[in-house]
Amino acid sequence: MTAESVMASFAGRARMVDLFAAEWIKFRSLRSTAATLAALVAVYLYLAYRGAQDSYQVWQSMPGRLRPAFDPAHGVFGGPTWMLAMIVAGSVGAMTVTGEHSTGLIRATFTAVPTRRRVAAAKCAVTAAAMTAIGAVIAAGSFAINETVLSGDHVSIPVSSADTIRLLAATSLLLPLCALAGLALGTVIGNTPATVVAVCVLFVFTPFAFKSASTRWTVDAANAMPFSFFSRLTVTGQGHLVGGTESVPAAWTALAAWLAVSAIIVISAMGWRDV
């Protein structure tokens, strides 16, 4: 069964469960999406192993007086390598809507289901759920690898600790956040190459541009960007906290705001945008 046949079978006001099913079929039928996400998981599990090895070497060479500040998760969950995951997730989210624009499927969808905002809500929910599952796999796998490598020196962190729960939750939510942001950009822009460029600018260049200005408001703006608050939420020690770093509650607030605003933009823009 194709996405077109599912949408054509709807008449009048479709039930949300039908819309969820249709959007899921469209999501998994996107070319190369499954391969891209599988490759993303494999790459980050490999990077987790390399990062854990680096953390182990740092711990071995660290003077005793500095060890209390050691962050056992930083080698895996810290650093700019996570920007790749953000770009991939944002691009996948964007293509869930720009691909429909290029094929004309979006017009067929709105012909079958005129209530555009219900379609948009279903698309947001399916995209977020799928990317959360991928994020959870990466988070759990990376954490397990890190624990395995570091447990021999008794420097790992307990699974039940508040830091671990926060770290796993933030990592699991990073991909759906970026996917929804990409979906919002794709809904507004409507062109795949331009949207991918916008995703890269938003997630990579904008945070560094804000930080380079070094004024109070630009620092606050930089802290509100996904990479910044993700980095804060994945810190499990004190060694990587510097001046101007936002608090954990502020980081969670920024994350929730990004999720909410992205979904609102998708639902609003899809209601008025020409297709």
What are these regions (language model features)?
Residues 2-13, 33, 37-94, 120-188, ...:
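Secretory targeting signals
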Residues 16-28:
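A short amphipathic helical element positioned immediately N-terminal to and/or at the very start
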Residues 31-35, 105, 118, 194-195:
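Residue-level recognition of membrane-helix boundary sites in multi-pass small-molecule transporters
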Residues 46-50, 192-228:
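Transmembrane helix segments
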Residues 90-112, 116-117, 124:
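Transmembrane helix boundary and interhelical loop/hinge segments in multi-pass membrane proteins
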